[in-house]
Structures are given as C-alpha cells and as structure tokens.
From Swiss-Prot:
Removes the phosphate from trehalose 6-phosphate (Tre6P) to produce free trehalose. Also catalyzes the dephosphorylation of glucose-6-phosphate (Glu6P) and 2-deoxyglucose-6-phosphate (2dGlu6P). It holds the Pfam family Trehalose_PPase. Keywords: Hydrolase, Magnesium, Metal-binding. The active site is at D20 (nucleophile). This is Trehalose-6-phosphate phosphatase. GO terms for biological process: response to osmotic stress; trehalose biosynthetic process. Mg(2+) binds at D20, D22, D198. Its cofactor is Mg(2+); Mn(2+); Co(2+); Zn(2+). Substrate binds at D20, L21, D22. It catalyses: alpha,alpha-trehalose 6-phosphate + H2O = alpha,alpha-trehalose + phosphate. The lineage of its organism: Bacteria, Pseudomonadati, Pseudomonadota, Gammaproteobacteria, Enterobacterales. Its EC number is 3.1.3.12. The gene is otsB.
Amino acid sequence: MTEPLTETPELSAKYAWFFDLDGTLAEIKPHPDQVVVPDNILQGLQLLATASDGALALISGRSMVELDALAKPYRFPLAGVHGAERRDINGKTHIVHLPDAIARDISVQLHTVIAQYPGAELEAKGMAFALHYRQAPQHEDALMTLAQRITQIWPQMALQQGKCVVEIKPRGTSKGEAIAAFMQEAPFIGRTPVFLGDDLTDESGFAVVNRLGGMSVKIGTGATQASWRLAGVPDVWSWLEMITTALQQKRENNRSDDYESFSRSI
C-alpha cells in the first residue's frame, strides 16, 4: 500500500537521490519548452548533491542536452531518453545507438503519418521518438496503433506509455535500468536509493528501488509500485525544502561544534 510521505529521510543515513523532472521537479506545461525548474529548487538539489558526495542524478525521458539546460548552472549525473543515454559522475557518457538507416526510416514513417493528426507532435530524440497528444487527446488510440506498428516492423524498438505521450525507444532501456547502472558506480554504490517520479515511465525505477530496499515516491494520483506518495509538484518542493533546511541546520551545528572544540584547545 502506498503511504502519504510526511517526513524527511534520516540525514545521518547515506542516500542516493534520483529525480524525474517533468511532473516531479517542475510542473507539466502544454509544451515541453515552457517547463522551468525554480532556481531555489535547483539550489536545493545542488546542496543535496554536495551533502551526498555527488550521489544525485536526474532521470528523465528528456534528452541529456535538455536536462543540462533545465539544470543550469549546475551539472548533475543524468539519464536521458528513459535510460537510452546516461552520464556518470565523471562525465563519461553511455549511449544506446540506433543504426542511422533505422532511425531515418522510422522518422520518415512517423512524420508522414502524424501529419494526419492535427495537434499531435512528433519529437525525435535520435535513438527514440515521442508522439505527443496533450493538445489532441482524441488521437490517442490512433497514435498508439501507429507506435505499435513501428515496433512490429522494427522489433528492436519498444513502446513506453506516459502522460499524453507514447514513446518508441530501444528495447531494454528504462529508467529502472539506468538507476540500477548508477547504483553499481561511485558515488552511488552502497547507498540507499531514493527515487521520485510521477508517470508510468517511472514505475520501472520504483521496482528497482524497492528491490534495493530504497524509498520510492509516486507524485500524484494513480496506481503505482511506489511505497510512498506526494500529492503534486508543490509538495515535492516543500519536501525538498524541508530536507535542505535540515541539512543547512546540521551544517551550522557542525560549524558551531568545531568552533567550540577549537576554542577549548587554545
């Protein structure tokens, strides 16, 4: 059973932090280009990353280029395109490549067909494709059928449903696989994973985090594998602010203790 999340984690423990972006750190907007992560939330993430020796990553369906732009001026480890591309703490990238001929043929087919559905949008991500229908929900079934046809023609591709979107991505890639990969690397290894996400695309991440004995947090309504729930993005912001406030207080207390110890020694 998923429980409401009302408390922050014990700060003395070692956590590895993973955050989805759209619908978790930032409100969903009619168009992806309109999404913004508030400056104070980015500052909080940086503080949390520093306190955790860098063990914080953004896990998203967006590309890593988009994630870096949204996280400026900070630079975090990332998993983009649902794990099809990943950047570790050292800046090394791990990318699943799609043969150029396949990517080109899929793109041509999708561009040709999606023109029949006004309001629907095709987002090409190199090795993956997203069919957005937030502005044209009446086309959901048709776009799902289109995506299924693509995966039948190219079985190395798989479907990933999300909120008002269906994605076509390399088979075997997922947010869960990305989190599992991070958890095998420094500085994440040996820590307890915490993952916050709002969408169907995040369920694979929840499954991995649960298996590792971590904290999985669903944002919003709907059935989920997550153990905890926050009602919406403002609740995520409030929860993060509680954590960062506690971290700052802990840091101030440590400085005070260090000063007192120094004073007694002279």
